[in-house]
Amino acid sequence: MKYLPLVIMVTLAYLIGNISPATLIGRFYGIDIKKAGSGNAGTTNVLRVLGTKAAICTLLIDVFKGFIAVYIAQGRFNNLGAMLAFAAVVIGHIYPALFKFKGGKGVATFLGAAMALNWPSMFAAAL
């Protein structure tokens, strides 16, 4: 019973990772992003196919979902919980069950999750 909250958190992190803004924004524009451009459901393909505004929205949502999943897990659990949520949200982005296991590459989600773990290091690395 003591591991149940951790299992629930990891499952929720995976489901958060399943949110594919590239696919959803593509649907909003009436385009299947997985069949256009490079076929990848990621920010770069959205930039190529749909333009800058759609790509910025995709990027921000991908970063935010990685950040929020790890931030919540870190506040509720120890470092193990944060690391498991980190892995789950990135895996959920790359292999989303809601979109037939065809997602993006996970770069923006990874950066958001890493930012939640240690944001000063992420800003230093960006310089």
Identify what each model region corresponds to:
Residues Y14-S20, A41-G42, K65, A69, ...:
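Glycine/serine-rich anion-binding loops at beta->alpha junctions
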Residues K2-F28:
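N-terminal signal-anchor transmembrane alpha helix
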Residues P5, M9-V10, A54-L60, K65-A97, ...:
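Nucleotide and nucleotide-moiety/phosphate-recognizing core
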Residues L47-L50, A73-F77, A88, G92, ...:
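Interfacial segments of multi-pass membrane proteins
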Residues G26-R27, L60, Y71, G112:
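Hydrophobic alpha-helical membrane-insertion segments
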Residues T23-A54, G103:
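Cytosolic, membrane-interface loops and tails of multi-pass inner-membrane proteins
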Residues I16, G30, A73-F77, K100:
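Short helix-capping/hinge motifs at transmembrane helix termini and TM-loop junctions
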Residues L12, I25, D32-G37, I61, ...:
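Short, flexible coil/turn micro-motifs enriched in small/turn-prone residues
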